[in-house]
Amino acid sequence: MASITNLASSLSSLSFSSQVSQRPNTISFPRANSVFALPAKSARRASLSITATVSAPPEEEEIVELKKYVKSRLPGGFAAQKIIGTGRRKCAIARVVLQEGTGKVIINYRDAKEYLQGNPLWLQYVKVPLVTLGYENSYDIFVKAHGGGLSGQAQAITLGVARALLKVSADHRSPLKKEGLLTRDARVVERKKAGLKKARKAPQFSKR
């Protein structure tokens, strides 16, 4: 009996409330923001790159505006116009439309000076037929060109403008023909031959 009373007194002396905590044990993890957060400089760079990709470059905006301008000036597209001419040179082909205006030249929806890289000779090629007849400030030139290089395209535009001016008046034929602006330049690069380095260049001959 004494052992039972001793056991009961020892159990009553224990306080479970003091040993058991009110909150369960919790494991603290670091916040996701602190682990994956970018440095301030890299975050700024990322935001700048995102804004740069969203905003379109000014060149594309100019092309879009010129496209709208050309469509407003040429209802129905190039094929529906009356004063039109096609010119060719080497591998280049140019479709030219003339409209009464102030002398603007637009090639592939870009300003001629920008498209021809500011080359004065190529810019002169484009306006030679108009200058010959004194119309350099009387017509706007709209061009769709493809194939070849810029030099070939500029010379193809020359022929296209001259042919388009014939549709304005048949009296233009004589002065344009006198300047050789209605002649199609049929010269193209000569093909390479087998056994030669180029079209005609041969390897050095050795007799012995």
Swiss-Prot record:
It is found in: Plastid, Chloroplast. Keywords: Chloroplast, Plastid, Ribonucleoprotein, Ribosomal protein, RNA-binding, rRNA-binding, Transit peptide. GO terms for molecular function: mRNA binding; rRNA binding; structural constituent of ribosome. This is Small ribosomal subunit protein uS9c. One of its GO terms (cellular component) is chloroplast envelope. Belongs to the universal ribosomal protein uS9 family. One of its GO terms (biological process) is translation. HAMAP family: Ribosomal_uS9_B (MF_00532_B). It comes from Arabidopsis thaliana (Mouse-ear cress). The keyword Kinase does not apply.
